Regions:
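Cytosolic, long alpha-helical scaffolding segments
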Residues: 1-258
Length: 258
């Protein structure tokens, strides 16, 4: 009947009101206890809420430090190519290996911070990828130095030295880009310019590598030496590719946030 229908609707409505009232009372009690805890132990409650506040400052210095390690490794690589003795090459490799380990330490520290920070300045994946790619460039430099030390080839040609100089140029632009990370949302012009430079340098590196490989197969008659030089040059070229990939990640940041 109509009376039964309205009675059922009334009971249903009342039950919802009672449920809402119950929730309000629970929230009210929670707020009361929270206010009491703030008064009694302000340090504890501040520490709790600090987990949910942005921790932007700590990521920027860490990324900057990682880029500085990259720059230093690129300088040592250039220096290493000026020396031909096995002992000197081994010494330079050890220096670069130490820098590679420092790069690994900073990269893992960034990953650890990502795991404990609730709010990050960019998406976690972007920070993770940026740190990983810079670490890849350092790994590439280390791989070049290792092969030079182990293979002990004839003096590196001017093309090889040119590739190492291009790697250093890319490292410098990556360092500059890290300086812009904190403010690029408002002024993305410089960061965009550095990304373009990284792309241009990588194209130059491709040209240098292709020209050298063509000449190598035309002129080198010693098969063992050919294999040594080709592999070292390939590692140098791969390292320029890794540096350009840093630029691609930075371009994505500009698209997403600027």
């Amino acid at each position: 009947s109509i009376e039964e229908f309205f009675e059922a609707m009334y009971i249903k409505h009342i039950s919802k009101v009672e449920e809402y009232g119950k929730r309000c009372r629970i929230l009210s009690e929670l707020y009361r206890r929270l206010a009491a805890s703030v008064t009694a132990e302000p340090g504890k409650i501040t520490a709790f809420f600090s987990q949910f506040t942005p921790k932007e400052p700590k990521f920027f210095p860490l990324l900057k430090q990682l880029s500085e390690v990259l720059c230093e490794a690129s300088v040592v690589l250039i220096e290493s190519l000026q020396h031909d003795s096995p002992t000197e090459r081994s010494d330079y490799y050890k220096k670069i290996k130490d820098l590679e380990r420092e790069g690994d330490r900073l990269t893992h520290l960034i990953f650890d911070e990502l795991g404990t920070t609730f709010i990050t300045p960019f998406d976690r994946e972007d920070i993770h990828d940026l740190a990983s790619c810079m670490d890849d460039v350092i790994d590439g430099i280390n791989s070049c130095a290792k092969r030079i030390s182990i293979y002990n080839p004839r003096p590196i040609s001017e093309n090889g030295k040119e590739l190492s100089r291009l790697i250093q140029e890319e490292a410098i632009y990556i360092c500059k880009a890290m300086d812009e990370l904190e403010t690029f949302r408002k002024k993305p012009t410089l960061l965009r310019e550095y990304c373009s430079k990284l792309h241009e340098i990588e194209n130059q590196a491709d040209d240098v590598y292709e020209f050298f490989i063509t000449k190598l197969f035309e002129e080198e008659k010693d098969c063992i030496e050919l294999i040594k030089i080709k592999e070292i040059m390939h590692e140098l070229e791969k390292t320029t590719d890794a540096a350009e990939h840093v630029g691609k990640i930075l371009k994505n940041l500009i698209v997403k946030y600027a």
